[in-house]
Amino acid sequence: QYKKVLEEKTEQIKQSGVSEADRIMKVENKIAFLENQQKEIQEAINSGNHAFHIARKILEDLDSAKNWSTFDLMGGGLIADMAKYDKLNKVQDKIQDFQNALRGFRTELADVTERISGDLYVEIGDFLHFADYFFDGLFTDWMVYDKINDSRNRTLRTSDQIQKILGQLNDMDNELCCKKENLQEELEQTVLNSDT
């Protein structure tokens, strides 16, 4: 009920043309701008979470492939080979999804790059370089233990970078929430203190 009354009074003030009307519209425009920024940040967070989830799944399969490869190096035989290939096939199936998720994340981050440092942008470019390396390089020699280990380390670094960026995006979102709350409070006080 309070919110509805406040909205009605806000509209009355804006239509009356008193000095507070201009101030109210400026604050409302600032709030709308912040809400748009928050929307862009949330889209980037969602996209980053998707990429992070795929990276974690790839890491699980690479860890398993690494273990089977170690067992194979110690004479594990046909069962170790089959298990290793199975895990590497699962990784290969996920790589294209991961590459697409990284591209999507990069696209979403482009909408908020003016708020993110230049160094971070370079790291985002490295994501795609990593994905291209992984997609092109791993499976030409995928029985080699070192390739599995190297790919695992690259996936882990990329996952860590995604997590770091997600932390920065969450910090930005929290900062925008505080600014928006302050503006909403300013708007409310302007309306309540108006004589209209």
Briefly describe each language-model feature range.
Residues 25-111:
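Domain-scale macromolecular recognition modules
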Residues 1-62, 148-196:
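Long, non-membrane, amphipathic alpha-helices that form coiled-coils
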Residues 64-94, 107-196:
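Long amphipathic all-alpha helical oligomerization modules
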